[in-house]
């Protein structure tokens, strides 16, 4: 009986570890804070976006489901030409944030991640943002 329990436990551990997405290792990055700061209303995304921007290459090997595991569900997504998908994560100035300054859609700070037709992340861009970590 104990042998069966050991085998079942081992199988469950292997299954669990194979289903989780490995987070990109970035010093100072708090993924939980990013996910819980919807639309950037608490300002935590503004503190973290520079780390994502400077480490873009670490986010370019993931598919859409893996990006959702890492950064949470995007606040907006668009289907683009040739079956490309674009995820948008808002950083600042979104109307969903009550009591804060808002701006028009094209003036908001937001993270854009583009996926190709094969569901691979191909580019990452932060709109209306100058990264203080880049020189």
Where are these regions (language model features)?
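Sec-dependent signal peptide recognition
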Residues: 2-10
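Residues within mature, well-folded domains
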Residues: 20-135
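C-terminal motif of bacterial Sec signal peptides marking the signal peptidase cleavage site
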Residues: 15-18
């Amino acid at each position: 009986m104990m042998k069966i329990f050991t085998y079942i436990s081992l199988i469950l551990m292997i299954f669990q570890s194979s289903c989780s997405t490995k987070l990109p290792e970035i010093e100072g990055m708090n993924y939980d804070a990013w996910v819980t700061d919807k639309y950037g209303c608490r300002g935590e995304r503004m503190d973290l976006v520079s780390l994502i921007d400077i480490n873009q290459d670490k986010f370019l090997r993931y598919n859409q489901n893996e990006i959702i595991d890492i950064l949470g569900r995007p606040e907006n997504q668009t289907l683009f030409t040739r079956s490309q998908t674009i995820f948008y994560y808002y950083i600042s100035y979104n109307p969903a944030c009550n009591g804060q300054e808002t701006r028009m859609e094209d003036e908001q700070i937001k993270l854009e991640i583009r996926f190709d037709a094969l569901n691979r992340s191909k580019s990452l861009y932060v709109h209306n943002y100058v990264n203080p970590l880049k020189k």
